[in-house]
C-alpha cells in the first residue's frame, strides 16, 4: 500500500466556509479572585466576507462609502440634500 496525500487542505476549506457563511462568536468572561469578581468582559464578534456581511445588513454604509471613494479616486462626492436639492 502506497501512502497518499490528501489534496484538500483543511485550513483552506475552513477559510472558504468562514468567508462564505460567516460565524458569530459570543463570549462572557468574569475574572474572580477569592470569589470576588474583579473584571467582566463581554465579547461579540461577527466574522465573514464583505459580501456576506452586507447581505446581513452589516457595514452597508461603510462598504458604499469605500466603493464610492475607490471609484472617484479618493474624492468624496457630496450627496444632494433632499430638501434643497443641493
Swiss-Prot record:
Disruption phenotype: No longer makes gas vesicles in H.volcanii; cells translate GvpA but do not make gas vesicles. GO terms for molecular function: structural molecule activity. PROSITE patterns: GAS_VESICLE_A_1, GAS_VESICLE_A_2. The keyword Methyltransferase does not apply. Pfam families: Gas_vesicle. Keywords: Gas vesicle. InterPro entries: Gas-vesicle_GvpA-like, GvpA, GvpA-like_CS. It is found in: Gas vesicle. GO terms for cellular component: gas vesicle; vesicle membrane. It comes from the Archaea. Induction: Transcribed from early-log phase, decreases as cells enter stationary phase, probably as a long gvpF-gvpM RNA. Highly expressed in 25% salt, poorly expressed in 15% salt, no gas vesicles are formed at 15% salt. Belongs to the gas vesicle GvpA family. Proteins GvpF to GvpM might be involved in nucleating gas vesicle formation. A minor component of the gas vesicle. Gas vesicles are small, hollow, gas filled protein structures found in some microorganisms. They allow positioning of halobacteria at the optimal depth for growth in the poorly aerated, shallow brine pools of their habitat. Expression of a 9.5 kb mc-vac DNA fragment containing 2 divergently transcribed regions (gvpD-gvpE-gvpF-gvpG-gvpH-gvpI-gvpJ-gvpK-gvpL-gvpM and gvpA-gvpC-gvpN-gvpO) allows H.volcanii to produce gas vesicles. GvpF to GvpM interact with each other in vitro, and may form multi-subunit complex(es). Might interact with GvpA. This is Gas vesicle protein M. It comes from Haloferax mediterranei (strain ATCC 33500 / DSM 1411 / JCM 8866 / NBRC 14739 / NCIMB 2177 / R-4).
Amino acid at each position: 500500500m502506497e501512502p497518499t496525500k490528501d489534496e484538500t487542505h483543511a485550513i483552506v476549506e475552513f477559510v472558504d466556509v468562514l468567508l462564505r457563511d460567516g460565524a458569530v462568536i459570543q463570549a462572557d468572561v468574569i475574572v474572580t479572585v477569592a470569589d470576588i469578581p474583579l473584571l467582566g468582559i463581554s465579547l461579540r464578534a461577527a466574522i465573514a466576507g464583505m459580501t456576506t456581511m452586507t447581505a446581513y445588513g452589516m457595514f452597508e454604509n461603510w462598504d458604499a462609502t469605500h466603493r464610492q471613494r475607490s471609484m472617484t479616486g479618493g474624492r468624496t462626492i457630496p450627496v444632494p440634500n433632499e430638501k434643497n436639492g443641493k
